[in-house]
Amino acid sequence: MLKPALLYTQEITRKFTEHLYTTDYFYYCGYPCGNNLPKIEEKDDLYQYAIVDKNDDIVGFLTYRINDYSDTVHDFGLFSFDKGNPILGYDLFRKLEELIKKHHRIEWCVVSTNPVKRHYDKFCKRHNGYIHHWHETTKDEYGNYIDSYTYEIINRGRQQNENP
């Protein structure tokens, strides 16, 4: 279940701190040895959620921005504090479906080594989206250049699938 991250600011910060300098954090921030914790804050264009289970335990974090002028949803961030928990994927894709129906365009990025990439590929294809491949855009923690992908789904008024 998605709940406003402001309700869980201290717990989210603590959980992120435990994951600094890890490969999982690299997948979240896009560069190795990242040490900038996400700021949980109130801003008009910023949406931040704690992903919680039935016991109200935090299993993940989701953030994105909405540009009202272009009606574009962008700057997604997703982090799992409980690897393999299906609640995270379920809540993410339910939110993406909602955003696709409501807004003109959504976009997000992923590095090629992120295991969730294959799920993003399927989701984007199901919605007739575009996948842009960028070569050698960043280095991993071992200094190897890796590729990244940008996903783009444009709602041109077509009927969206109700039950993916």
Q: Model regions: which residues?
A:
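A short, well-structured alpha-helix characteristic of acyl/acetyltransferase catalytic modules
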Residues: 1-40, 157-164
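Alpha-helical elements of Rossmann-like donor-binding domains used by nucleotide-donor carbohydrate transfer enzymes
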Residues: 14-18, 91-95, 150
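Acetyl-CoA-dependent GNAT
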Residues: 26-85
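Short hydrophobic/aromatic beta-strand or adjacent loop that forms the aromatic wall/cage
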Residues: 46, 146-150
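Conserved acetyl-CoA-binding loop-helix of GNAT-fold acetyltransferases
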Residues: 85-101, 118
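Conserved beta-strand-loop-alpha-helix junction that forms the acyl-donor binding cleft
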Residues: 107-125
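Conserved catalytic-core motifs of GNAT/GCN5-like acyltransferases
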Residues: 127-146
